[in-house]
From Swiss-Prot:
The gene is rps12-A. Keywords: Chloroplast, Plastid, Ribonucleoprotein, Ribosomal protein, RNA-binding, rRNA-binding. This is Small ribosomal subunit protein uS12cz/uS12cy. Its main location: plastid. It comes from Vitis vinifera (Grape). With S4 and S5 plays an important role in translational accuracy. Located at the interface of the 30S and 50S subunits.
Length: 123
């Protein structure tokens, strides 16, 4: 516990909250252009080929974003919308690509949880 004299000398510093998605610059989503689309393997207990894209955002950041869902049409120079949200078993992947917007089409033949994968209601 500081003394009154110590508090006069230097005041208490407010706790700064660190953002988990700094590249979005406080925006809910950001537009970006894919510079590379590739697959990476997840951390230890899991095994797969996860689809990711290197994206250059309008904020100037170059980030790695996960492409959710089965199958995708994203390639180099595709314009995509990026939201925050990390992938737990992929270190360094802190963003998701939003399916069903801009150049990223929705997941084909998706019946449940459609809104998360940009799929319209089937007729």
């Amino acid at each position: 516990m500081p003394t009154i004299k110590q508090l006069i000398r230097n005041t208490r510093q407010p706790i700064r909250n660190v953002t988990k998605s700094p590249a979005l610059r406080g925006c809910p989503q950001r537009r970006g252009t894919c510079t590379r689309v590739y697959t990476i393997t997840p951390k230890k207990p899991n095994s797969a080929l996860r689809k990711v894209a290197r994206v250059r955002l309008t904020s100037g950041f170059e980030i790695t974003a996960y492409i959710p869902g089965i199958g995708h049409n994203s390639q180099e120079h595709s314009v995509v919308l990026v939201r925050g949200g990390r992938v737990k078993d992929l270190p360094g992947v802190r963003y998701h690509i939003v399916r069903g917007t801009l150049d990223a089409v929705g997941v084909k033949d998706r019946q449940q949880g459609r809104s998360k994968y940009g799929v319209k209601k089937p007729k």
